[in-house]
Every structure is written in structure tokens, then in C-alpha cells.
């Protein structure tokens, strides 16, 4: 596996983990509230290169103590979200 393939795989894993953790933390699925997921919960270091790439792709934003999934992804299904990430990585 090349370095680029490893990075791509890691990026997808982090994106999906962020998506799942966000869904679990939301108290009300119809709520517009997007929780902050800590670096520890996401299991990444501050300013991890994959996280910065996801930020550049518009998937997340940084907060003082972690990251937040962008609002437009909060109501997507898991399959829709995975497809979005896949398409963005191919661009």
C-alpha cells in the first residue's frame, strides 16, 4: 500500500468516526446542535494532517477543544456521507 493510499484510508476512517460520534452525541436527531468531538474521542493528535485535509474539504471545522462536523452532513445517512467523502477524494 502506498503512502497516498494509507493517507486516503486513514482520512476516510477519521471522517466516518467523526460522523458516527457526532450522531451518537446528538441528543435530538432533529436538533440543529452539532457537538464538539474531542481530539481524544476522535483518537487523533491536534492538527493531524488527515484532519486538516478534511477541514480543507469542508467536512469539519476546528473548535477550541476538538472538531465539529459541518452542519450540512448532520442529517445525511451513513451511506450518503461515505459516498460524499469518496467523491471528494477522487477530485
What is the role of each PLM region?
Residues 66-71:
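Minor-groove-contacting beta-hairpin "wing" of winged helix-turn-helix DNA-binding domains
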Residues 72-91:
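Short, amphipathic alpha-helical interaction segments positioned at domain boundaries
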Amino acid at each position: 500500500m502506498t503512502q497516498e493510499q494509507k493517507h486516503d484510508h486513514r482520512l476516510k476512517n477519521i471522517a466516518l468516526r467523526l460522523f458516527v460520534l457526532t450522531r451518537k452525541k446528538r441528543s435530538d436527531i432533529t436538533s440543529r446542535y452539532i457537538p464538539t468531538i474531542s481530539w481524544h474521542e476522535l483518537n487523533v493528535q491536534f492538527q493531524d494532517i488527515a484532519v486538516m485535509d478534511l477541514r480543507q474539504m469542508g467536512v469539519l471545522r476546528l473548535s477550541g477543544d476538538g472538531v465539529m462536523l459541518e452542519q450540512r452532513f448532520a442529517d445525511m445517512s451513513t451511506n450518503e456521507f461515505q459516498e460524499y467523502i469518496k467523491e471528494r477524494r477522487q477530485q
